[in-house]
């Protein structure tokens, strides 16, 4: 393994995977006797590598190769024959008139539709992303907006769609960016007076995937440039897939015209996974790691960790790491011992007072209204929702929940839980309220 490969291996361990795939994987290395030349597909990557990674690359190169001279070039690494005949010159960064966007190196190939665990909370999002990948640019799902809390699988679906497009058409120009990367690229273009080039680079793609567009809020110039990019891609029938941490109309600081454009296609909420999906996710992630996890341990984690997929993965990573270190088998007792602090913190985060306040705020009530004896519909339904959420999200018994709601009988709590479950099968608004409250309480 040469010095660059060893340096890249260390960088992969130190930086987030999505950053490595976006900025470092597209680089082509030309390792010379006393220097390293890194070739990047475009000026964006040169800028990001110079600002964020170059100092660390030089440190690693000094350690592995004994020198720290690193030069950044835009273009492709010369072929060996050409390199032998080419005159020796000092490398320097230069910008070609039309640098190309790195269409292959910024998609994480690990995330596919095949390894996405489907459940009631995400099945519509999965279907929408799959359709967007099968028929990119179709007005029925262009743009496709996936929204929901952190760690629920939005980015997984986005990567899966991009990877499926490239699998179907290896020449497809699919570009993934986080919103702050779009912002940084635009700022750099403004500083260097290369906005025309910036616009051309983003408008030549077949599919543009941007994560976390709530970051655009309050950034007027960024929204303006994205608005024009959006229009050009939409008119050209190029697929746009976006994610947001909430429904865009709820994002303050996002321009009305941009919110209107986002409503042109399909917007799908990704909700926190239910118990069955959480258990399936734990078992699937364990299989990916080659770990043996008994079903009862997966059920324990799924029951206690209710917020998002990342928390489930974190619990699983902690469990398998300690099992490997100690050589102990993963049992229910071992899991409870290992995850004790994590599970306690999770339970403390979702308490009865927290649920009562969240429900009261959502329906424009006060907590005392939920606890009162009044039975008007405007109070009874939110009260039932709060009781049902408490049963769903905590370990409290029915009598304990009744006590917390002004000493109500446990049969009242049971009736509330059954009533809400039954109504949600036919009442779309109630289902929407329930999902939003789950999301708020899981944040």
Curated annotation (Swiss-Prot):
Taxonomic path: Bacteria, Pseudomonadati, Pseudomonadota, Gammaproteobacteria, Lysobacterales
Complexes and interactors: Oligomerizes as a right-handed, spiral filament on DNA at oriC.
Organism of provenance: Stenotrophomonas maltophilia (strain K279a)
Gene symbol of the encoding locus: dnaA
Localization terms from the record: Cytoplasm
Renumbered residue ranges of the record's region Domain I, interacts with DnaA modulators: 1-67
Region feature (Domain III, AAA+ region): 106-323
Domain comment (free text): Domain I is involved in oligomerization and binding regulators, domain II is flexibile and of varying length in different bacteria, domain III forms the AAA+ region, while domain IV binds dsDNA.
A GO cellular component entry from the record: cytoplasm
Positions with a binding annotation for ATP: 151, 153-155
Spans annotated as Domain II: 67-105
SUPFAM superfamilies assigned: P-loop containing nucleoside triphosphate hydrolases, TrpR-like
Protein name (Swiss-Prot/TrEMBL): Chromosomal replication initiator protein DnaA
A GO biological process held by the record: regulation of DNA replication
């Amino acid at each position: 393994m040469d010095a660059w490969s060893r340096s890249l291996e260390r960088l992969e361990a130190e930086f987030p995977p999505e950053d490595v795939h976006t900025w470092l994987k597209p680089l082509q290395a030309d390792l010379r006797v006393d220097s390293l030349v890194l070739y990047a597909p475009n000026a964006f990557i040169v800028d990001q590598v110079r600002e964020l990674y170059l100092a660390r690359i030089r440190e690693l190169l000094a350690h592995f190769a004994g020198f720290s001279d690193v030069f950044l070039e835009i273009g492709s690494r010369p072929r060996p024959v050409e390199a032998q005949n080419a005159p020796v010159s000092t490398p320097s960064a230069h910008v070609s008139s039309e640098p190309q966007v790195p269409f292959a190196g910024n998609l994480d190939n690990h995330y596919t539709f095949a390894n996405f665990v489907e459940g009631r909370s995400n099945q519509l999002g999965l279907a929408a992303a799959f359709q967007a990948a099968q028929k990119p640019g179709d007005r029925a799902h262009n743009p496709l907006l996936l929204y929901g809390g952190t760690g629920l699988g939005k980015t997984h679906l986005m990567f899966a769609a991009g990877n499926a497009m490239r699998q179907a058409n290896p020449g497809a120009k699919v570009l993934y960016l986080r919103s702050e990367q779009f912002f940084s690229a635009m700022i750099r273009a403004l500083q260097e007076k290369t906005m025309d080039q910036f616009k051309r680079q983003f408008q030549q793609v077949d599919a543009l995937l941007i994560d976390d567009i709530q970051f655009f809020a309050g950034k007027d110039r960024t929204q303006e440039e994205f608005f024009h990019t959006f229009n050009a891609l939409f008119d050209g029938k190029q697929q746009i897939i976006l994610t947001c941490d909430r429904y865009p109309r709820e994002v303050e600081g996002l321009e009305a015209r941009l919110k209107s454009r986002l409503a042109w296609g399909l917007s799908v909420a990704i909700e926190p996974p239910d118990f069955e999906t959480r258990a399936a996710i734990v078992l699937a992630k364990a299989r990916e790691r080659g770990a043996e996890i008994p079903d009862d341990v997966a059920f324990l984690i799924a029951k206690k960790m209710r917020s998002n997929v990342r928390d489930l993965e974190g619990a699983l990573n902690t469990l398998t790491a300690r099992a490997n270190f100690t050589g102990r088998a993963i049992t229910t007792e071992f899991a409870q011992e290992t995850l004790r602090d994590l599970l306690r913190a999770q339970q403390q985060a979702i308490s009865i007072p927290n649920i009562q306040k969240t429900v009261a705020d959502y329906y424009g009530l006060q907590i005392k209204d939920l606890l009162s004896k009044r039975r008007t519909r405007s109070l009874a339904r939110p009260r039932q929702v709060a009781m049902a959420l408490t049963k769903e999200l905590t370990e409290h018994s029915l009598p304990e929940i009744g006590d917390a709601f002004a000493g109500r009988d446990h049969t009242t709590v049971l009736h509330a839980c059954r009533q809400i479950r039954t109504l949600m099968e036919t009442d779309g608004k109630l289902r929407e309220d329930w999902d939003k409250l789950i999301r708020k309480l899981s944040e």
